[in-house]
Amino acid sequence: MKKFIFIGDSLTYGYGVYREESWVNKISALNKLTVFNKGINGDTTPSMLNRFFNDVTSKIPEYVFLMGGTNDLLCGRSVKSIIDNIEEMIKEALSIKSNIFIGIPPIIIPKMANKLFMPSDLYNYCEKSLPLLRAELLNLCSNYNVSYIDFYTLCNKNLYKNIFLDGIHLNSLGNDIMFKEACKIFSL
């Protein structure tokens, strides 16, 4: 079976839901690919870039999914720094001829996150920066001819369905929506 490595943060890992409810683990359960979930709760793009060789490149996977940036924004980092890090990871994955998919991070809900996750003054900055991150990621995907999954738009469209656990992370319904969209994009 072909190897598919998913690298990212808690949105890739499946924070807050049972393992079998995580969108990445649902893809693994299809038994069509050998899936490695390298999502780490709280991870940022500098950290992902730092571990990219060990977790991804050295394994020579046929497919790579990469999503990050929300935690960077929650640390006050710029969209440019996120894009620079993701671009380096794209170049590295292309150097081993992997098929790459970029995840565009979902929206966040600052009011809900302040109440249910933890208080932070940076939620509004993150919320305002995510559309810019989305636009820059779309440009990056176009420049490198890389596929993407637009979880930002997907979550925006499904917001009325109560898909969030805490304003940042998705609940089991949110993960199911992500899983179905990923299956379409991955042709599974």
What are the language-model segments listed below?
Residues 1-47, 51-60, 177:
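Serine-esterase "nucleophile elbow" of acetyl-processing enzymes
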Residues 30, 50-188:
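Alpha-helical cap/lid subdomain in secreted, periplasmic
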